[in-house]
Amino acid sequence: MSAENESPGLPNGGACCASATGHFLLVGNKVTVVLGAQWGDEGKGKVVDLLAQDADIVCRCQGGNNAGHTVVVDSVEYDFHLLPSGIINQNAIAFIGNGVVIHLPGLFEEAEKNLKKGQGLAGWEKRLCISDRAHIVFDFHQAADGIQEQQRQEQAGKNLGTTKKGIGPVYSSKAARSGLRMCDLVSDFNEFSQRFKLLAKQYKSMYPSLEIDIDGELKKLQDYADRVKPMVKDGVYYIYEALHGPPKKILVEGANAALLDIDFGTYPFVTSSNCTVGGVCTGLGIPPQSIGDVYGVVKAYTTRVGIGAFPTEQNNDIGEMLQTRGHEYGVTTGRKRRCGWLDLVLLRYAHMINGFTALALTKLDILDVFSEIKVGVSYKIDGKNIPHFPANQEVLNKVEVEYETLPGWNKDTSNVRTFEELPENAKKYVQFIKEELGIPIKWIGVGKSRESMIQLF
């Protein structure tokens, strides 16, 4: 490329094109996004794993090690909380964006645990890139999380059911402008130490029972700073170059899910970040036009961990059966998940916010034993249909769900590998969901392994 043709100020001479109005628009690679469409645990890890096989960069854009993704490769089950699960692709770069909050002991512990399981993580430190603008979770954030939960329990008789990973407190520090970022850790350590001491002091005054070994913590952080320094990059420029350089496949794996979003979820029983599509732009520093496909991951029924409204919940044999057959325990907390029928009101709402281009319907095989299957299609309050998903939790707790009953298929689908092989009623169930939501279904999951994802188009 000659010097005259190079776009000024664009890394790699990124291409431009003129619009009809004469303004210059950037064109580049698009990112593919995978998001949870319910309350988490939908099987996002499996969809990401499928797409990550030929990805060049796999990103996390929000949340911390409160997320839990399980990926099975060559019969080895890897658990990811903070690391993008695409890190098991030896040819991809795993990128942790500025919207993610990082607990350094948790990061290294997670990598070491997975290294012991199999070869998937070999050489991970060379494949991980961390935004210098990402905030750091300290041990006292985690301790404060536990104290806050205890206080909620004592004062209100119920807590939020957080993972006690310090996520809420660190996002609070970020919003209060007292947090510390990766760029602070790897720059002047004396300056970092002063700010760390000040933040620790603030936490001590808020929570007098908090014990913080400041010198011990700083010594550990100094060690982490040395280990992590080669991985820390200016995330904005890194992602910009990836978008506007040579063709690349860039994948974003969302953590948590739409109904756990701080703005759009079932507040206050939500996480502390935006886990809808807007969080991808703010958590990576990319413009909306760089977003390509947005895949929503939907479990064939609904689950929720912890407390909060759950209109289609089944506190009965059906819920028990779903729980047992689906092995519904949280990856991060080990807590039993609450189970219920699929809720289309909730999914329409998630689609309004995220604009899914296609869905992955997972765990269809869990429904194999039911003679009839119900699907929540609308909500009523005092006998009147409500046209929207209520923001207020008390209102959501009161809704009556209108169900559509579909016939079950009573056949094992776990070895099915094409849509045509599915039992007739299973096809009808998938078709019903697709038509009601108006979103194409691209994958159907009928088991744990990578091979058990049936691709439709």
Swiss-Prot record:
Its EC number is 6.3.4.4. Mg(2+) binds at residues 41, 68. Its main location: cytoplasm. It catalyses: IMP + L-aspartate + GTP = N(6)-(1,2-dicarboxyethyl)-AMP + GDP + phosphate + 2 H(+). Gene3D superfamilies: Adenylosuccinate Synthetase, subunit A, domain 1, Adenylosuccinate Synthetase, subunit A, domain 2, Adenylosuccinate Synthetase, subunit A, domain 3. InterPro entries: Adenylosuccin_syn_GTP-bd (IPR018220), Adenylosuccin_syn_Lys_AS (IPR033128), Adenylosuccinate_synth_dom1 (IPR042109), Adenylosuccinate_synth_dom2 (IPR042110), Adenylosuccinate_synth_dom3 (IPR042111), Adenylosuccinate_synthetase (IPR001114), AdSS_2_vert (IPR027529), P-loop_NTPase (IPR027417). One of its GO terms (biological process) is 'de novo' AMP biosynthetic process. Binds 1 Mg(2+) ion per subunit. Substrate binds at residues 41, 331-337. GO terms for cellular component: cytoplasm; mitochondrion. Pathway: Purine metabolism; AMP biosynthesis via de novo pathway; AMP from IMP: step 1/2. The active site is at residues 41, 69. IMP binds at residues 41-44, 66-69, 163, 177, 256, 271, 335. Its cofactor is Mg(2+). GO terms for molecular function: adenylosuccinate synthase activity; GTP binding; magnesium ion binding. It is found in: Cytoplasm; Mitochondrion. Homodimer. Plays an important role in the de novo pathway and in the salvage pathway of purine nucleotide biosynthesis. Catalyzes the first committed step in the biosynthesis of AMP from IMP. Belongs to the adenylosuccinate synthetase family. This is Adenylosuccinate synthetase isozyme 2. It comes from Xenopus laevis (African clawed frog). The lineage of its organism: Eukaryota, Metazoa, Chordata, Craniata, Vertebrata.
